[in-house]
Amino acid sequence: MAETATIARPYAEALFRVASEAGAGNLGAWSELVSEMGQVAANPDMQALATDPNISGDKLEEVFLSVLKSPVNDEARRFVKLLVENSRLTALPEIAEQFHALKNAREGSSDVEITSAFPLDASQTNELVAALERKFGRKLYAKVAVDPSLIGGVSVKVGDEVLDTSVRSRLAAMQAALTA
């Protein structure tokens, strides 16, 4: 994984520079396109195509671009061509992650992973995100998951920081205190 991250970094930085030069208004569109490209490249069938020595670079590029639903501009086409020529299409999911991290850093925002024991409705999610934004002092983009093993409460991850208020973690802490 570290090797893929190292390979992906210069590609992500270069693509981010190109997207930034296109204007701040286009950064959102670029982010969506790069995210979609990363998802398509992560598909096992696409991974198999990308590593198949019998598939020509032109054919791989054509197939990859035809699968994308978002409109693809000339810069993105050239970027895909560069990845195919350098046999780096399989690194595109990591490139997309690093691109997203660069975008968040530019905007002063972060992603937040919220895991709840029970499904949260939109108002609960918005209220929780608003409280977390006040705590962390920046805009947060929520990704919500449900994990019944938490028993109750939520676990929140923002970057490297984890806030675990789940019943499961409290029970584990009580067990550790009682057995110590």
Swiss-Prot record:
Cellular component terms (Gene Ontology): plasma membrane; proton-transporting ATP synthase complex
Record keywords: ATP synthesis, Cell inner membrane, Cell membrane, CF(1), Hydrogen ion transport, Ion transport, Membrane, Transport
Gene Ontology MF terms in the entry: proton-transporting ATP synthase activity, rotational mechanism
Keyword Thylakoid: no
Transmembrane segments: none
Membrane topology field: Peripheral membrane protein
Entry superkingdom: Bacteria
HAMAP family for this protein: ATP_synth_delta_bact
Family: Belongs to the ATPase delta chain family.
Protein name (record): ATP synthase subunit delta
The organism's taxonomic lineage, starting at the top: Bacteria, Pseudomonadati, Pseudomonadota, Betaproteobacteria, Burkholderiales
